[in-house]
Amino acid sequence: MAKKVEALIKLQVNAGMANPSPPVGPALGQHGVNIMEFCKAFNARTESIEKGAPVPVVISVYGDRSFTFDMKTPPAAYLLLKAAGVKSGSGRPNTEKVGTVTRAQLEEIVETKRADLTASDLEAAVRTIAGSARAMGLSVED
């Protein structure tokens, strides 16, 4: 019989940098999960990802205090800022542009995030990511 899921914990942890300090420790500790076991497993699975990239993770905690976790792709905002070479988005995106991304960069981001996007085809996914870029104050070039 399958184990019963007691809790779902959603966190955003930097790749290769999980440690027992907040936010990881308190979130897992209140559910009785072995924090160091999670940190070691997470850091091992994120070795192939650029160190320090934020990785959303969903942790399923079971009744016997065991756990499994699913990693998502880094947020579109992080990938867009990295592609544009800027530190943060604009405080006033409609009037103040902070950087530029090309269509080729958008397509590269779409390929990275393909598993997490709900768009039916490549063009729709590119439009979705382009909308995120514009909302952050990045201009989009064709």
UniProtKB/Swiss-Prot annotation:
<dbReference type="InterPro" id="IPR036769">
    <property type="entry name" value="Ribosomal_uL11_C_sf"/>
</dbReference>
<keyword id="KW-0689">Ribosomal protein</keyword>
<comment type="function">
    <text>Forms part of the ribosomal stalk which helps the ribosome interact with GTP-bound translation factors.</text>
</comment>
<dbReference type="InterPro" id="IPR006519">
    <property type="entry name" value="Ribosomal_uL11_bac-typ"/>
</dbReference>
<dbReference type="InterPro" id="IPR020783">
    <property type="entry name" value="Ribosomal_uL11_C"/>
</dbReference>
<dbReference type="GO" id="GO:0003735">
    <property type="term" value="F:structural constituent of ribosome"/>
</dbReference>
<comment type="subunit">
    <text>Part of the ribosomal stalk of the 50S ribosomal subunit. Interacts with L10 and the large rRNA to form the base of the stalk. L10 forms an elongated spine to which L12 dimers bind in a sequential fashion forming a multimeric L10(L12)X complex.</text>
</comment>
<dbReference type="InterPro" id="IPR020784">
    <property type="entry name" value="Ribosomal_uL11_N"/>
</dbReference>
<protein>
    <recommendedName>
        <fullName>Large ribosomal subunit protein uL11</fullName>
    </recommendedName>
</protein>
<keyword id="KW-0687">Ribonucleoprotein</keyword>
<dbReference type="GO" id="GO:0006412">
    <property type="term" value="P:translation"/>
</dbReference>
<dbReference type="InterPro" id="IPR000911">
    <property type="entry name" value="Ribosomal_uL11"/>
</dbReference>
<keyword id="KW-0488">Methylation</keyword>
<dbReference type="GO" id="GO:0022625">
    <property type="term" value="C:cytosolic large ribosomal subunit"/>
</dbReference>
<dbReference type="InterPro" id="IPR036796">
    <property type="entry name" value="Ribosomal_uL11_N_sf"/>
</dbReference>
<dbReference type="GO" id="GO:0070180">
    <property type="term" value="F:large ribosomal subunit rRNA binding"/>
</dbReference>
<dbReference type="Pfam" id="PF03946">
    <property type="entry name" value="Ribosomal_L11_N"/>
</dbReference>
<dbReference type="Pfam" id="PF00298">
    <property type="entry name" value="Ribosomal_L11"/>
</dbReference>
<keyword id="KW-0694">RNA-binding</keyword>
<comment type="similarity">
    <text>Belongs to the universal ribosomal protein uL11 family.</text>
</comment>
<keyword id="KW-0699">rRNA-binding</keyword>
